[in-house]
């Protein structure tokens, strides 16, 4: 299986990489959060642009991206607008969403973008190609905050992301039962062992699913999300605790 290298970080080998999310509403918030994150132990900084109030003004978005880049100089920057329908803070039209991601790619300030699988195949494929032309990696994602689909459906979605050119397919689902967590882990193993030719990221959310955030190296998930301050999704644990557990499992 091939790995994905972003800056000096190799995703898909060794312990799962830790991603943290920055969620400031204004440029001032974004700067202060980035400064607070500077000393934290993580691997990838995700900027959750859907939390940013001025998201429809390209100049403001790029100014904020530049501010983050000036403060966090050494870590890969992942640009993510999470749509309202997949748990995000705001809604954009498909045209606005694609234009925003293309502007991020054009800026040269971001290393990765997050594209939601269900944006539309043609739009997704074209935007993946555009990102790759500019040496920007693509995490393709799907989120279900209500349930855990069947393992076959989870695998099918991850395979579809791979077919559409994602560098890293990602899925996050909500467990209603403990068995749902096993469903997600089973799907992860099946995808990783039978179909994946690149790293994948999977997680079962909430307190019930927290084991999935810790045991990625065992089951086949190449990265996990931790919290520096406020969690960006239910079930996230602090980056310090996360690193400790990931290291223990890696060295076992």
Curated annotation (Swiss-Prot):
Q: Which reaction does it catalyse?
A: 3-dehydroquinate = 3-dehydroshikimate + H2O
Q: In which pathway does it act?
A: Metabolic intermediate biosynthesis; chorismate biosynthesis; chorismate from D-erythrose 4-phosphate and phosphoenolpyruvate: step 3/7
Into which EC class is this enzyme placed?
lyase
Among the GO biological process terms of this entry, one is: 3,4-dihydroxybenzoate biosynthetic process
The active site lies at 143 (proton donor/acceptor), 170 (schiff-base intermediate with substrate)
Source taxon at top rank: Bacteria
Question: In which residues is 3-dehydroquinate bound?
Answer: 21, 46-48, 82, 213, 232, 236
Q: Which residues form the signal peptide?
A: none
Q: Which GO terms describe its molecular function?
A: 3-dehydroquinate dehydratase activity
Q: Which NCBIfam families match?
A: aroD
Q: How does it assemble?
A: Homodimer.
As for what it does, the entry says: Involved in the third step of the chorismate pathway, which leads to the biosynthesis of aromatic amino acids. Catalyzes the cis-dehydration of 3-dehydroquinate (DHQ) and introduces the first double bond of the aromatic ring to yield 3-dehydroshikimate.
Protein name (record): 3-dehydroquinate dehydratase
Traced from the root, the source organism's taxonomic lineage reads: Bacteria, Pseudomonadati, Pseudomonadota, Gammaproteobacteria, Enterobacterales
Gene (UniProt) = aroD
């Amino acid at each position: 299986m091939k790995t994905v290298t972003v800056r000096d970080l190799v995703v898909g080998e060794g312990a799962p990489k830790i991603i943290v999310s920055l969620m400031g509403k204004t440029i001032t918030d974004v700067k202060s959060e980035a400064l607070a994150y500077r000393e934290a132990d993580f691997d990838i900084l995700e900027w959750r642009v859907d939390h940013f109030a001025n998201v429809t003004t390209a100049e403001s978005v790029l100014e904020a991206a530049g501010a983050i880049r000036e403060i966090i100089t050494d870590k890969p920057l992942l640009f993510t607008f999470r749509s309202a329908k997949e748990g995000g803070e705001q809604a954009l039209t498909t045209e606005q969403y694609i234009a925003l991601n293309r502007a991020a790619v054009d800026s040269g300030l971001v290393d990765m973008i997050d594209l939601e699988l269900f944006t539309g195949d043609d739009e997704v494929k074209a935007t993946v190609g555009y990102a790759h032309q500019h040496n920007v990696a693509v995490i393709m994602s799907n989120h279900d905050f209500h349930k855990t689909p069947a393992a076959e459906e989870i695998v099918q979605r991850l395979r579809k992301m791979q077919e559409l050119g994602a560098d890293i397919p990602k899925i996050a689902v909500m467990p209603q039962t403990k068995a749902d967590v096993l469903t997600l882990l089973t799907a992860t193993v099946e995808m990783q062992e039978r179909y994946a030719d690149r790293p994948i990221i999977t997680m079962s959310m909430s307190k019930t699913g927290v084991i999935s955030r810790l045991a990625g190296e065992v089951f086949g998930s190449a990265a996990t999300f931790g919290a520096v301050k406020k969690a960006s999704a239910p079930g996230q644990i602090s980056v310090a605790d996360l690193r400790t557990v990931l290291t223990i499992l890696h060295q076992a």
